[in-house]
Amino acid sequence: MRRNFFASALLFALSASFCFAQSGSVAILEDFKPSILNQPGQEYPQVNSQRYARFRIIAPAADSVRVSLGLGGRGGTKLAKAADGSWMGTTAGPMDEGFHYYNVNIDGGKFNDPGTLSFYGSIRWESGIEIPAHDQDFYALKDVPHGHVQQV
């Protein structure tokens, strides 16, 4: 009897955890800030505190725009066209911390994002975006007191 009770309780706990895991998607916080690798004066691409990236490309005559980040074969991030001719989109999920190469696919052609710096990697120049690490402050340069060095 006691064994059946514990088995039932365990089964209930496991099934409840699966239900919570499948409940709706997480709301994306709108605290986006320009990436540290942007060209001077450029607002996009942007990164938020949840590690999502948002891209904006101005291509009024384009039929389709996609940002290719190499996200496990998911086809990248498809951008939606706005009334002003710009294209904007946010990654489907949070990105890993660190540096990521990417390119912009406009009507089948691969281009670098003019809003960010370009980096040489993967045998070509590509755009780059930095997703800040949660422990980046530990490695940042800080104004700390220094001792006096002398020879005795």
Give the role of each language-model region.
Residues R51-F55:
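Structural beta-strand segments of beta-rich domains
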Residues M1-F5:
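Positively charged n-region of N-terminal signal peptides that target proteins for export
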Residues A16-C19, G73, M88, Y101, ...:
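Polar low-complexity intrinsically disordered regions enriched in Ser/Thr and small residues
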Residues Q46, R56-E97, G109-S122:
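Aromatic-rich carbohydrate-binding modules that target alpha-glucans
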Residues A7-S17:
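Bacterial N-terminal signal peptides
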Residues L11, P60, V144-G147:
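A generic structural signal for short, non-catalytic loop/turn and secondary-structure boundary residues
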Residues A21-V47, G93-V152:
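The feature marks proteins involved in alpha-glucan
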